[in-house]
Amino acid sequence: MDQTQYILNKKLVEFLLYSNQDCSLIVIDALITIGANVNYIDETNYNDTPILSVITKTSESNPETVKLLLDKGADVNYQNKYHETALMRTIKYGNFGIAKILLDYGANPYLLDYKNRNSIMIAKEFNVIPMLNIINLYDKKNKDNSDKIRLEIDRIVNIFVD
């Protein structure tokens, strides 16, 4: 990686971590467009990628920022130094809206962290029981893509997002 690429990657992570919550999607998109890597591994921060960084910043992560990173190719199932995924971190913060987005983009709730826990086990450990319902409904949705299941997922998420 050349110096310019390194600087762009660091600026993207810094912007995601330190800008205010309503961080400008235009700036993020511009950084990515000119070469910042949405899958850049920050070796100084647990080998996190930008999507993990934005979820670290706050339990109220901007859904549009998360969607933009995913639309630009962020790996939804990337595991950091501790094998933690974006979904696992989101569950710890109890952010149902972000969890739904991650699951919509294909987050795998069965990956294991360094303690051999998957997202379901983490939801139980952190007592985020509604998250278990969401994950179970996504499993059903993947097997039987019905409108009834999608509506139930939206209903549960909306209870906690509104």
UniProtKB/Swiss-Prot annotation:
It comes from the Viruses. This is Putative ankyrin repeat protein R664. PANTHER family: ANKYRIN REPEAT AND SOCS BOX PROTEIN 8 (PTHR24134:SF9), ANKYRIN REPEAT-CONTAINING PROTEIN DDB_G0279043 (PTHR24134). Keywords: ANK repeat, Repeat. SMART domains: ANK (SM00248). InterPro entries: Ankyrin_rpt, Ankyrin_rpt-contain_sf. It holds the Pfam family Ank_2.
